[in-house]
């Protein structure tokens, strides 16, 4: 009966028969809630560490991808440059070939003219020898 009167007044006895303001059941629930909150905070901390690690990993991969992209762009530009150099060299060689063909044609014409002169001179010599 004394417990009932004290209970109505908001006072309770715990398992050690100590006088408490809170109901022992509420006290137990409060302790459990406090432990659950502590576990939750610990898990949130672990989650943040994991997420932080993942963010660092993604950042590192992004940097590596950017570096590889820049290397690829550089290689592509180098290939374009080499292709342009080869094209210019090819044009120079074609111009040189055309020049050499023209020179060859001049030499051929000159050779034919010299052959004609030689034939005329040989004919003249032959006529001169026969007249004597």
Curated annotation (Swiss-Prot):
Function: Part of intraflagellar transport (IFT) particles involved in ciliary process assembly. May play a role in the trafficking of ciliary membrane proteins from the Golgi complex to the cilium. Regulates the platelet-derived growth factor receptor-alpha (PDGFRA) signaling pathway. Required for protein stability of E3 ubiquitin ligases CBL and CBLB that mediate ubiquitination and internalization of PDGFRA for proper feedback inhibition of PDGFRA signaling. Essential for male fertility. Plays an important role in spermatogenesis, particularly spermiogenesis, when germ cells form flagella.
Gene that specifies this protein: IFT20
Protein name in the entry: Intraflagellar transport protein 20 homolog
Pfam families: IFT20
Coiled coil start-end: 74-114
Cellular component annotations (GO), alphabetically ordered: acrosomal vesicle; centriole; centrosome; ciliary basal body; ciliary base; ciliary tip; cilium; cis-Golgi network
Keywords attached to this entry: Cell projection, Cilium, Cilium biogenesis/degradation, Coiled coil, Cytoplasm, Cytoplasmic vesicle, Cytoskeleton, Differentiation, Golgi apparatus, Spermatogenesis
Record has Nucleotide-binding as a keyword: no
Keyword Cytoplasm: yes
Tissue specificity field: Expressed in almost all tissues.
GO terms of biological process kind: cardiac muscle cell differentiation; centrosome localization; cilium assembly; cochlea development; establishment of epithelial cell apical/basal polarity; establishment of planar polarity; inner ear receptor cell stereocilium organization; intraciliary anterograde transport
GO molecular function, one term: opsin binding
């Amino acid at each position: 009966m004394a417990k009932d009167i004290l209970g109505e007044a908001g006072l309770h006895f715990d398992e050690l028969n100590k006088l408490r303001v809170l109901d022992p059941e509420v006290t137990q629930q409060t302790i459990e809630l406090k432990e659950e909150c502590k576990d939750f905070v610990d898990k949130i901390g672990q989650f943040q560490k994991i997420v932080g690690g993942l963010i660092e990993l993604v950042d590192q991969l992004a940097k590596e991808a950017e570096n590889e992209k820049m290397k690829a762009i550089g290689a592509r530009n180098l290939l374009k440059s080499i292709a342009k150099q080869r094209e210019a060299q090819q044009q120079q060689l074609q111009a040189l070939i055309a020049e050499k063909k023209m020179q060859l044609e001049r030499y051929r014409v000159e050779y034919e003219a010299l052959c004609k002169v030689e034939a005329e001179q040989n004919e003249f010599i032959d006529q001169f020898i026969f007249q004597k």
